[in-house]
Amino acid sequence: MSVPTVLEKILARKAEEVAERSARVSLAELETLARAADAPRGFARALQDQVKLKQPAVIAEIKKASPSKGVIRENFVPADIAKSYEKGGATCLSVLTDVDYFQGADAYLQQARAACKLPVIRKDFMIDPYQIVEARALGADCVLLIVAALDDARMAELAAVAKGVGLDVLVEVHDGDELERALKTLDTPLVGVNNRNLHTFEVNLETTLDLLPRIPRERLVITESGILNRADVELMEISDVYSFLVGEAFMRAESPGSELQRLFFPERGVPVSGSTLD
């Protein structure tokens, strides 16, 4: 019997989590909460508007820990981090809500969104329509669909549920086969290329560059994972990739927003402040 990969372990636990949550709060109750939630802020539109100007469209991630790195940030106050990111020039936020493997929480998404005006994606392993409705009830503006975690029928079902509740969809791929499935199954304009292999958690920036020629121009490409310095940013920009999802590089910095500005908007200079998060 083969040893389960990291992704397989996460998905097995996620199925248990969905069962536990749906036993506590029914889908009908969630749908009521979703209808009462603040209107979506337009996640895809915000990225598209920035990319049209050939300016970095940064999805700044709020992430306390990961399976591969353990705890990434000890001083973890989502509302303060969100404000710092907004000040530093982020276009959108990504908030980890997975509890068991990333030490995330639903409350972190709510706190971050309430602290700023940026659109927010719920970063989690979505496998069930329940989670999609739950995301909207929490106030999310977008959800992540990971092709490696879903078959085509479920992927299409989740995207349809997302559209029904007013959520944008970011579909995430890692290789050519996943990209082909995503393009065939979904019409979302947002295609994220994860440079991290979710089975091994190894990172290679060439993943984005290799897949880029196969992605239609009308789709917006977001490079995810492994962007750590200006050279990485410039490598993507010369290839006409202007949207980035970055977490660890910011989370390890004393001031996440200042690090965002340093990496993506160096011409603005880095703000000097007494606060570690300003």
Curated annotation (Swiss-Prot):
Domain of life: Bacteria
InterPro entries registered for this protein in UniProt: Aldolase_TIM, Indole-3-glycerol_P_synth, Indole-3-glycerol_P_synth_dom, Indole-3-GlycerolPSynthase_CS, RibuloseP-bd_barrel
Enzyme class: lyase
UniProt keyword terms in alphabetical order: Amino-acid biosynthesis, Aromatic amino acid biosynthesis, Decarboxylase, Lyase, Tryptophan biosynthesis
Catalytic function, reaction form: 1-(2-carboxyphenylamino)-1-deoxy-D-ribulose 5-phosphate + H(+) = (1S,2R)-1-C-(indol-3-yl)glycerol 3-phosphate + CO2 + H2O
Annotated Pfam families: IGPS
Annotated pathway: Amino-acid biosynthesis; L-tryptophan biosynthesis; L-tryptophan from chorismate: step 4/5
GO MF term list: indole-3-glycerol-phosphate synthase activity; phosphoribosylanthranilate isomerase activity
Similarity comment: Belongs to the TrpC family.
NCBIfam families reported for this sequence: PRK00278.1-2, PRK00278.1-6, PRK00278.2-4
Protein name in the entry: Indole-3-glycerol phosphate synthase
Organism: Pseudomonas fluorescens (strain ATCC BAA-477 / NRRL B-23932 / Pf-5)
Organism placement in taxonomy: Bacteria, Pseudomonadati, Pseudomonadota, Gammaproteobacteria, Pseudomonadales
Gene: trpC
